[in-house]
Amino acid sequence: MSTPAILAEDLHKSFGETHALAGLNLAADEGTILGVLGPNGAGKTTAVRILTTLLKPDSGRATVAGLDVVKDAAKLRSQIGLAGQYAAVDENLTGKENLEMVGRLYHLGRAVSSQRADELLERLELTDAASRPAKTYSGGMRRRLDLGAALVARPPVLFLDEPTSGLDPRSRIGMWEVIRQLVRTGSTSVSYTHLTLPTILLV
């Protein structure tokens, strides 16, 4: 039996008297999309911060891509992509420069970083804005650029926080198609949102 791409067992995390997680268990197989739904304050962000090595659990165990999120944190960071709710881009760099920079941070060669940047800009319908500084982008364009940054290294596991927040219907459909293409190659995607399932399907 293969090891799940993501596995969490009895995760607990508290902040003072607030219990953010109280025995979380979840599993996602390779090449699937896992949706984590819940209202604000339900612990979704806390769970993902633990799974992406940004926060240590109080107790319990979790592995991502076969690596322990605590013991193998440094190695695991090269195996995941993370696109947050708020676009984390350098406003003074162009769209292409942002993606190339991420590629270099993942130790990709200059030529590979440039090629992947061009491919992602096209898939995310940002080619016409590739040479413009990110500070001139609309909110939706920044969201797409942020997703592109998470995809540059073609990570086996991708975490998405409210992936379609602030996007118009066409951009939402396009973004989900990019995510599905990645999953078809064997990657695993975790999307966490407060939207209900019918709402997600409509957009």
State what each model feature region is.
Residues P39-G43:
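Walker A (P-loop) phosphate-binding loop of ABC-type ATPase nucleotide-binding domains
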Residues L158-D161:
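Catalytic Walker B motif of ABC-type/P-loop ATPase nucleotide-binding domains
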Residues T193-T199:
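Conserved small/polar residues in nucleotide/adenosyl-binding loops
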Residues R154:
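Conserved catalytic motifs of ABC-family nucleotide-binding domains
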Residues E100, R104, A111-A129:
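Conserved ABC ATPase "signature" region
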